[in-house]
From Swiss-Prot:
It comes from Schizosaccharomyces pombe (strain 972 / ATCC 24843). Component of the mitochondrial small ribosomal subunit (mt-SSU). Mature yeast 74S mitochondrial ribosomes consist of a small (37S) and a large (54S) subunit. The 37S small subunit contains a 15S ribosomal RNA (15S mt-rRNA) and at least 32 different proteins. The 54S large subunit contains a 21S rRNA (21S mt-rRNA) and at least 45 different proteins. Disulfide bonds: none annotated. The keyword Transport does not apply. Its main location: mitochondrion. This is Small ribosomal subunit protein bS21m. Residues 1-14 form a transit peptide. GO terms for biological process: mitochondrial translation. Transmembrane segments: none annotated. Component of the mitochondrial ribosome (mitoribosome), a dedicated translation machinery responsible for the synthesis of mitochondrial genome-encoded proteins, including at least some of the essential transmembrane subunits of the mitochondrial respiratory chain. The mitoribosomes are attached to the mitochondrial inner membrane and translation products are cotranslationally integrated into the membrane. GO terms for cellular component: mitochondrial small ribosomal subunit; mitochondrion.
Amino acid sequence: MNSSYFPGVLGVRWVHTNRKLQKRKEEHGAFQDSLHFMIPAAETKDLGASVTVGNSLTRAFRQVDRICQRNNVPRLFRSQRFYEKPSEKRSRVRSERHRARFRAGIVRLVNLAKNMRRWGY
């Protein structure tokens, strides 16, 4: 049985060993194995990122920490540590949404105040 390797999220490997697909491939020589739909689209995320360690090990660890922060790994780790009931999740998501909107409004007001001060008000 011939298996193909498809890179996945965070180094997860998907091995495809479907006999029907293999038979279909053999019957249709130019048939392409299109499993791109199995790999989730993550445009801003770093999938399978690697850091080269040169002279400084601490610098490499800092780069790994930055990659993890950019991908929200610590937040995901904390959120998946304990089970969260669906009603609690809805409440948390609602609260996070409200906080983000409130924060954006405050940032907008502070920027407006800075601009008004610059304009001479």
